[in-house]
């Protein structure tokens, strides 16, 4: 998943990717970042995401939970810090309480983490008005 998340982050112009926990540390040996986006984009493990949110960014939880706003109706803030839940669970309540908003992708069931990242970042780009970074073909 991390390799696919890094590829999506690179494709859609994210500035960095942060993660918590130890799953990635155990999976790092499998080298799933086939486009080596980690060389262009910081991938940083942190203890608590609340401590690393860049100044001016709005924390947005992405989780399939009661009360979340559907993505098709959502207007992304100019500077967002998206926090995604794990595939085999949900975000802790302290995280969703901390976030300004919680959004979800309307589906029948839950999505793979990397697929959800792609959908959210594509939606952000598609609803935006600056495609200049996305016109180059590589």
Residues of each region from the PLM?
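Active-site/ligand-binding-proximal alpha/beta "capping" segment
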Residues: 65-103
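Short, acidic/turn-prone active-site loops that include or flank metal/cofactor-
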Residues: 22-24, 86-89, 106-111
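A short acidic, often aromatic-flanked loop/helix-cap motif at beta-alpha or helix-coil junctions
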Residues: 48-53, 67-69, 110-112
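Alpha-helix C-terminal capping segments
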Residues: 49-56, 74, 96, 105
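Short secondary-structure transition/capping segments
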Residues: 28-32, 72-74, 115-116
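Structured adenosyl-cofactor binding patch, chiefly the S-adenosyl-L-methionine
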Residues: 10-11, 98-135
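RNA substrate-binding interface of SAM-dependent RNA methyltransferases
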Residues: 2-63, 125-130, 134-137
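Conserved RecA-like P-loop NTPase ATPase core
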Residues: 1, 9, 83, 116
């Amino acid at each position: 998943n991390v390799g696919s998340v890094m590829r999506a982050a690179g494709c859609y112009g994210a500035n960095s990717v942060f993660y918590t926990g130890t799953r990635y540390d155990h999976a790092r040996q499998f080298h799933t970042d086939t486009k080596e986006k980690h060389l262009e984009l910081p991938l940083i493990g942190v203890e608590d995401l609340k401590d690393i949110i860049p100044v001016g960014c709005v924390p947005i939880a992405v989780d399939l939970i009661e009360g979340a706003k559907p993505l098709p109706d959502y207007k992304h803030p100019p500077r967002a810090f998206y926090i995604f839940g794990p595939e085999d669970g949900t975000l802790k309540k302290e995280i969703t309480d901390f976030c300004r908003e919680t959004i979800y992708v309307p589906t029948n069931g839950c999505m793979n983490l990397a697929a959800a990242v792609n959908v959210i970042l594509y939606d952000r780009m598609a609803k935006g008005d600056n495609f200049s970074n996305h016109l180059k073909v590589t």
